[in-house]
Amino acid sequence: MKRVIFFAIIFSAVTISLGLTSCDKDTEIKDPNPFTLQKENYTFLKNSNYYLEVQKNRSPEYSDPFEIEDVQRIDKEMHIEVSFPAGCASNNFEIIWDGVVMESYPPQTRLFVKRTAGNCNKSDEREHRVLVIDLEEIFVKLRQGDPHLQDAIFIVSNASKRPDTSNADMPVSNN
């Protein structure tokens, strides 16, 4: 009986000490290889810290509102069609990736699209823009030719909206 109690105490002590030394959910892990690529109508950022910030804060207050109208994968490009209120002097889009490819079949990865607008006048009209991502240029170079990305499903998320039944994230595959 003493032996059972002794092992129970040891087990409890080990469990508690492991729980106290485990990683804190808010601990910031630095991205070892952040990457920024400026394109004609968007900026592509591979940055896990920024990705987590966007994921945590996604809302109309965090990203200026816009809609993702359509996402298509055409050959080695992804076309993200967005619409947003007209009347802004500047509309900058960021495509944010954390660099993670989920090991599933087919593999999956997630992207956020964020809009920053400036000098806006109220308007009922909408502008449309297509953000064309050259997947080979960005992902294959970053992942040293990782063949998994050729077949990956990309889940594209709007940083100005929280996901719910009417605002689902949009998956797109090469099929």
What are these regions (language model features)?
Residues 18-22:
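C-terminal motif of bacterial Sec signal peptides marking the signal peptidase cleavage site
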Residues 1-5, 24:
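Positively charged n-region of N-terminal signal peptides that target proteins for export
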Residues 74-125:
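Mature extracytoplasmic domains of secretory-pathway proteins
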